[in-house]
């Protein structure tokens, strides 16, 4: 039996093995790279800080009037970012608020407008309700959020006297608009 000889390997294989060993040792001597910074949010998303400003602005509107409500903020796709119920408010209000926000995001209109359209053309807008089931609520209180004409989300408010849900949602949006230049 003959022993293994380095000279019996083709020269290219020997060079490849030496290169692998050299690179492996060089890699061990290097310090690990710092982790990459977190990527910036795409422009179609709103931050949790922006969401908090919307919620706080709407709640301040309700508190000034000694009312209780639920509020929800959804992203551009209608997915929930956050929902809250004020102390003493109905447990159903955040769900109704989310359904209003979802409808406003999906159809890029206020739920007040959608509700009026449903009344004039129920055959056309009945499909909205059938398509999404209880995820849409076509009464006032859902308002889309846009930046530079592009939808970034929507706000829904529920539980206030008639006509006041949308005003509270708009108060939240006004608070968001004030803080946005500092955030982006």
Regions found by a protein language model. Name each.
Residues 28-184:
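Flexible, solvent-exposed loop/hinge segments and secondary-structure transition points
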Residues 1, 22-25, 125:
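Intrinsically disordered, low-complexity segments enriched in small/polar residues
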Residues 10-26:
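Bacterial N-terminal signal peptides
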């Amino acid at each position: 039996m003959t022993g293994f000889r380095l000279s019996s390997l083709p020269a290219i294989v020997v060079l490849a093995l030496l290169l692998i060993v050299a690179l492996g040792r060089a890699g061990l001597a290097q310090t690990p790279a710092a982790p990459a910074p977190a990527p910036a949010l795409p422009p179609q998303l709103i931050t949790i800080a922006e969401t908090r400003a919307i919620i706080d602005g709407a709640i301040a509107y309700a508190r000034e009037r000694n009312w209780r409500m639920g509020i929800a903020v959804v992203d551009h796709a209608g997915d929930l970012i956050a929902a809250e119920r004020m102390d003493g408010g109905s447990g159903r209000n955040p769900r109704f608020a989310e359904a209003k926000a979802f409808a406003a995001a999906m159809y890029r209109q206020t739920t007040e407008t959608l509700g009026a359209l449903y009344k004039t053309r129920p055959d056309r807008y009945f499909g909205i309700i059938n398509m999404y089931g209880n995820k849409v609520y076509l009464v006032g209180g859902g308002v889309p959020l846009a930046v530079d004409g592009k939808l970034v989300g929507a706000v829904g408010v529920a539980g206030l006297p008639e006509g006041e849900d949308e005003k509270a949602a708009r108060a939240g949006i006004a608070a968001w608009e004030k803080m946005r230049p500092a955030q982006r």
